[in-house]
Amino acid sequence: MSQSKPLVFAMVAGELSGDILGAGLVKALKARHPDARFVGIGGPRMEALGFESLFAMEELAVMGIVEVLSRLPRLLKVRSSLVSQLLALKPDCFIGIDAPDFNIGVELKLKQQGIKTVHYVSPSVWAWRPKRIFKIAKATNMVLSLLPFEKAFYDQHQVPCTFVGHTLADDIPLELSKADARETLGLDRDAEYLAILPGSRGGELKMLSEPFIKAAVAIKEALPDVRFITPLVNEKRREQFLTALETHAPGLEIQLFDGQSREIMAASDGILLASGTATLEAMLVKRPMVVAYRVAPLTYSIASRMMLIKRYSLPNLLSGKDLVPELIQADCTPQKIASEVVAMMNRDNRALIAEFTEMHQNLRQNASERAADAVDVLIGANAPHGRSSNEVG
């Protein structure tokens, strides 16, 4: 169809991983629709591409049931204001990127007013609260899933879903040089490094900094030559981690970096990290890992009763096997973490890396382009270079 005015795409990304996905999609849609406007809530990567943020992304980056409750009045105010502004703007499509507890409510209100809605990143309906799929069906015209097993779940319930793969799998080479990463970061070419990634959100660092730092002390005793490297997403998180380091192990040396998490992972011999998207990135970088996580006790008590899965990290979920150790909640102790990390650093991990490589190949689908294809088809926009917008995939 011919556009009489530039397209408007509204998007909301709730945290760092959503900003990465959003930036890829903005770039792909911009290539097709150079005059399009992109507006909503995004992070620095999206904003660097000309995205207009109506609120700071940090407002949405909260975790856990208890933590969300304390911020609920502000979150509801942000959502209400955002919906009002978007209804006035009447975008051609709204794309909620992850953050389902925030975005699905937005999608529902917009869809009821005739605006096309897409949810990019399936909520973990296969893991817990499966009945959410009915609300998702009511709120969205299309779900874009990153993982192959998710589409089958949606197909069972006749909810429109497109498997697009994961942008991280597209962006990260099948082989990433450890030596090159060390040179980039100015690290010793021959030393042994453990990357420590306690998360990107304030709530994660609050829960994980202490056990990770205390574990590092024990790891250093068992492996005296090991060195620690930690990327932190911004100055707030750096200050938060430094405070924890001074409190729990003032004499421990950990080299801190601003961002550069992928380079840090690639430079390492092994990784200790919080559960979440970072576990996928660690898998794609092909480094062995130990995954640990804990939340507020009440949050865990409520959530664990609703869980349908026994595995939490993406390498284990994708493989259907216990490929990497997971230390969740009561198991997330300095002693258990240190024990698993020392074992990981001492073992031959070649078979594990081969499994990671196979999973990487399966997730490589040119995700941003496939997502942009699906959005174009949904809104009936012309595909670029004379290609029919029906030729998706």
UniProtKB/Swiss-Prot annotation:
User: Which SUPFAM superfamilies does the record match to this protein?
Assistant: UDP-Glycosyltransferase/glycogen phosphorylase (SSF53756)
Q: Which residues cross the membrane?
A: none
What Pfam families would the database entry show? LpxB
Q: In which pathway does it act?
A: Bacterial outer membrane biogenesis; LPS lipid A biosynthesis
Can the keyword Glycosyltransferase be found in this entry's annotation? yes
Question: Which regions form coiled coils?
Answer: none
Give GO terms: molecular function aspect only.
Answer: lipid-A-disaccharide synthase activity; phospholipid binding
Name the chemical reaction catalysed here. Answer: a lipid X + a UDP-2-N,3-O-bis[(3R)-3-hydroxyacyl]-alpha-D-glucosamine = a lipid A disaccharide + UDP + H(+)
One GO biological-process annotation of the entry reads: lipid A biosynthetic process
Q: Which family does the UniProt entry place this protein in?
A: Belongs to the LpxB family.
Its biological purpose is as follows: Condensation of UDP-2,3-diacylglucosamine and 2,3-diacylglucosamine-1-phosphate to form lipid A disaccharide, a precursor of lipid A, a phosphorylated glycolipid that anchors the lipopolysaccharide to the outer membrane of the cell.
Protein name stated in the entry: Lipid-A-disaccharide synthase
Taxonomic source organism:
Shewanella amazonensis (strain ATCC BAA-1098 / SB2B)
